[in-house]
């Protein structure tokens, strides 16, 4: 998420959002989000933030993440990438809304069928989700892949539709990751929803003003938005937490002050 650094907008900085939300499959870990402040959008920033993380990362199509999946990745093993079907759908929707393309309409219909299965299995265990996806979703995804290949052979790669189809094809491996692990979501909408409050807040807090201000913005936003997704009232949490720190809350028990552990006083 781009944030302005100076009033004349000649310099820009970014907040990168990293989120965890296992509620759709009944995970035990509470949801949370952290906004990392960085002076740019280059892939090395993501590499730094994710140093030590090994696993599956749900992302959009931004190419800066590509280095994370390479054997040469710094800070850990190559990350398994799960790409976002909502972004794939959005590409076709843009074409359909503009041109009324029948090809785009057919692609949208196929994606809608895949999403219908996700609606059916939301809230079930990872094993149940995986079984349903392998039995029901995998054939639909395979059919979409066949359809995608056929349309790319018919449509000029330089056309608007051709460019959108190429985008989907370029991310095809990552679009299939959700078929192999029941914990993986079909899209990255959860984290995108957590970026939206930052974008809205820019209208009220137009400028970070300084690198330290940007970093502080990210830290405070991390606490506030994590409160909100855990149904914790942010002001009550911040007030109680500051009071606890002022009263000498021990650093050895810092986890007690995380938003999901907050217990409001009666």
What is each stretch, according to the model?
Residues 1-266:
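Catalytic center-proximal scaffold of phosphoryl-transfer enzymes
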